[in-house]
């Protein structure tokens, strides 16, 4: 699991967001988001800003290592 993937899962859970709504706001299909979260699809660099915006966090938050407190 990538850091971005783990953070997306954590943020979606913490904010109690609907995955379908996150996908819509990110401009991707619900299936694409599901594939990303399940590790079946790689998160392209050009998707990161849209995903961060969709979960209402700054881009660096997706790269933060929560376990290390960074």
Model-found features: residue ranges?
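Short, basic-rich loop-to-helix N-cap that marks the start of a DNA-contacting helix
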Residues: 40-53
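Short alpha-helical DNA-recognition segment
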Residues: 16-35
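Short, charged recognition helix plus adjacent turn
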Residues: 10, 16, 35, 53, ...
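Residues that mark the N-terminal boundary/hinge immediately upstream of a DNA-recognition element
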Residues: 7, 18, 44-47, 58
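A short, Lys/Arg-rich alpha-helix, primarily the initiator
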Residues: 1-18
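The DNA-recognition helices of helix-turn-helix-type DNA-binding domains
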Residues: 29, 40, 66-69
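Small-residue (primarily alanine) positions within well-ordered alpha-helices
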Residues: 5, 23-26, 52
């Amino acid at each position: 699991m990538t850091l971005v993937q783990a953070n997306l899962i954590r943020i979606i859970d913490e904010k109690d967001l609907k995955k379908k709504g996150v996908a819509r706001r990110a401009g991707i299909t619900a299936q694409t988001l599901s594939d990303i979260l399940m590790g079946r699809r790689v998160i392209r660099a050009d998707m990161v800003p849209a995903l961060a915006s969709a979960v209402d966090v700054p881009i660096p938050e997706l790269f933060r290592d929560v376990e290390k407190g960074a």
